[in-house]
Amino acid sequence: ALLSGNTIENGGITVKPNVKKSEVLKKIATGDLIADGTCDFTATSSVTLTERILTPKEFQVNLELCKTPFRADWDALSMGLSAFDTLPPDFASFLIAHVAEKVATKIENNIWQGADGTEGEFDGLVALATADATVVDVVGTTVTAANVIDELGKVVDAIPAALYGAEDLNLYVAQNVYRAYVRALGGFASNGQGANGVGGNGTNQSLGDVMFDGVPVFVANGLASNYIVAAESSNLFFGTGLLSDSTNEVKVLDMADLDGSQNVRVIMRFTATVNYAYGSEIVLYTPA
């Protein structure tokens, strides 16, 4: 469940499993490494180590429902003939899938726009980057099909030269930014104002994976509207405990044998958090 949000599932972030309490993200900084050769050993640069901490936060899902309402409907036979009913298996499967989907959606939102002070959330990447003076900030606006090319251009122009061209560099965009970009490509971005866009097919086409100025555009469903982040996926980290806790352990407990009640409980426990290593290698576009 935890790993089925689109940022994680599509490889937009590096997953660090088996983090029991915390994990240190080591950062190394050096100066110019190469110097003229001599007979003696002389350090050609200093090495500075700093760190950021990945500390997963514990979360839980606790739900309870009564089996009695199912007796009167078409699922009654699937509950068995005993007075100690069981939850209809089809509904139990649906309930597990429903919980897994809701958790995945919430985690996707937390990855980008979570706030640690809010129940059920941890600080997301936007909150962390906003508080970090080393992050490259770009002041944004409301993104539309008419201005999306210029706004994406501002982000790409702000990407550090050493980062541009990196294999895993992405432009993480909110859904509305992606829709605006696709509409622009279908209408006027490539072939001139009023033209039929990429391939001459207007908006009647599937563009598939798109790029901007050589950088892949990654739709991050958890990003709030009008936000854009440029970063390497290898610089963004999602930390959790055992992957089995995160992905498979949605438990359905029938309470009949435990307390004699007609209740069923749905339980899930997991840990999660995000962080990044290098703030100076992240560009954050924030709408004004």
Give the label of every model feature segment.
Residues 1-32, 123, 127-142, 146, ...:
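Sequence/fold signature of self-assembling virion shell proteins
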Residues 2-77:
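Assembly/oligomerization interface modules of large self-assembling protein complexes
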Residues 67, 129, 175-177, 270:
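Short, flexible loop/turn elements at secondary-structure junctions
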Residues 74-158, 285-288:
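Alpha-helical scaffold segments that mediate packing/assembly in large oligomeric complexes
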Residues 75, 110-116, 166-174, 193-196:
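Short coil/turn segments at secondary-structure boundaries
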Residues 100, 104, 108, 175, ...:
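Internal mixed-charge
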Residues 150-188:
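Ordered core of a single globular domain
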